[in-house]
Amino acid sequence: MSKSPVAIIILDGFGKRAETVGNAVAQANKPNFDRYWADFPHGELKAAGLDVGLPEGQMGNSEVGHTNIGAGRIVYQSLTRIDKAIEEGEFQENKALNNAFTHTKENNSDLHLFGLLSDGGVHSHINHLVALLETAKDKGVKNVYIHAFLDGRDVAPQSSLEYLETLQKAISDLNYGAIATVSGRFYAMDRDKRWERVEKAYKAIVSAEGEKFEDPIELVKASYANDKNDEFVVPAIITKDGKPVATVKDNDAVIFFNFRPDRAIQLSNAFTDKEWDHFDRGADHPKNIKFVTMTLYNPSIDAEVAFEPIEMKNVIGEVLSNEGLSQLRIAETEKYPHVTFFMNGGRNEEFPGENRILINSPKVETYDLQPEMSAYEVTDALVEDIKNDKHDAIILNFANPDMVGHSGMLEPTIKAIEAVDENLGRVVDLILEKGGSAIIFADHGNSETMSTPEGKPHTAHTTVPVPVIVTKKGVTLREGGRLADVAPTMLDLLGVKKPAEMTGESLIQK
């Protein structure tokens, strides 16, 4: 039977900004997007700050965006939850955190804090690290050591010195704690099974393998002199009197303070997985450690969780499933967790009638080297699926504008957007041919802002609104939409009643 599918098409990191300087979206040749914009109802969506459950003025990101899209409601994010817990005193009494503190006291051992050192608010926040230091001191933990992962991606490429200085000031004010290792997130926070990267971070933390520096500031400056920005700082060891400040040893406790799971899973597994076979962890692999993660990274990780997920009922996948509609989730590796786990409200398993296609992202050092990434392969697989009338609903993500946008390089990002546009045309024209419709939009901004006002590369997400197109003639879109309104719009196009839990509203004016 022929199907007329309704698709959610996410152009990841494709924001809307009037200024064309440093704007890859505006400068790209994108005839298909421009044609849909001209021919169909369009507008913009809010995708940052309070509109997606983040603090006011906080840029959106893919995890937050896809969670809000799938939920059809504003979902208060981990960043906001943890901030609130610190403010209201719940953080200090958190059971999992206190279990880590107790473990060190009972074993006369050390506490180690792992995480991304910035105020980017995408994976972590430096305020949470400072709160952990204050709380550990209050609770009588004797020694605490920080293993700092440098950002340079959700914040400026060379901004780690200011975060290290903020951290050193907190250490000095509290007269408590020390930085033990420093690593660029490229190594410590890989999510693409590049195990040789994770191994470098792991061995720095456990075996003090790596270059030695007495001062983290000098370490970063040496890295810059070597043309390696924060993200790419090779894992290195901080020493005192010629000896490593600290390594993770038997009976220690670890708190991984990243709240976003995807880039914290592999390193967590390196410490906790009993069946590990990705690299030789060596004789130093610590035994009997208490491992605590800020949020649930993956149910398979042997760790206590400080902030358990809030279960959500009636996300888009569940509603489609309950209606007996078939649905496809499709993306390349970089954004596959977003169209599955995050879109399903933090649920790994499929709903009945939900199918998934994962296309591998290319194995390149950085995506500016291959701006098209796997967009053509994703599209080939999807076109085949649509031609064969497989699914009633489709959720697709094109990763390129975001992943190449993070390079801070304008030309490759323009190429990335042009590749996406070509593939967007193939998908949407086929859907229209089948009598279906698509909601084309982005989860957050990035590629529309590739340079700072000073003309330096801009690699982070932004707070700008994102464009939205609904490829259905004869309807009008209301203004003031946000990401939470996308799922209700899909249901509207499918003729399905929106459940009470979805507080978002269809973008189509009645």
Swiss-Prot record:
Keyword Manganese attached: yes
Any one GO BP annotation for this protein: glycolytic process
Cofactor: Mn(2+)
SUPFAM superfamilies: 2,3-Bisphosphoglycerate-independent phosphoglycerate mutase, substrate-binding domain (SSF64158), Alkaline phosphatase-like (SSF53649)
Keywords from the UniProt entry: Glycolysis, Isomerase, Manganese, Metal-binding
GO cellular component: cytosol
Pathway(s) served: Carbohydrate degradation; glycolysis; pyruvate from D-glyceraldehyde 3-phosphate: step 3/5
Protein residues bound to substrate: 123, 153-154, 185, 191, 260-263, 335
Catalytic function, reaction form: (2R)-2-phosphoglycerate = (2R)-3-phosphoglycerate
Annotated binding of Mn(2+) 2, by residue: 12, 62, 443-444
One Pfam entry name: Metalloenzyme
InterPro entries, alphabetized: Alkaline_phosphatase_core_sf, BPG-indep_PGM_N, Metalloenzyme, PGAM_B_sf, Pgm_bpd_ind
Binding site for Mn(2+) 1: 402, 406, 461
Cofactor binding notes: Binds 2 manganese ions per subunit.
Top EC class for this record: isomerase
Annotated EC: 5.4.2.12
Active-site annotation: 62 (phosphoserine intermediate)
One annotated GO molecular function: manganese ion binding
Entries under HAMAP family matching the protein: GpmI (MF_01038)
Function: Catalyzes the interconversion of 2-phosphoglycerate and 3-phosphoglycerate.
Similarity-based family: Belongs to the BPG-independent phosphoglycerate mutase family.
Record text on subunit structure and interactions: Monomer.
UniProt-recorded name of the protein: 2,3-bisphosphoglycerate-independent phosphoglycerate mutase
Organism expressing this protein natively: Listeria monocytogenes serovar 1/2a (strain ATCC BAA-679 / EGD-e)
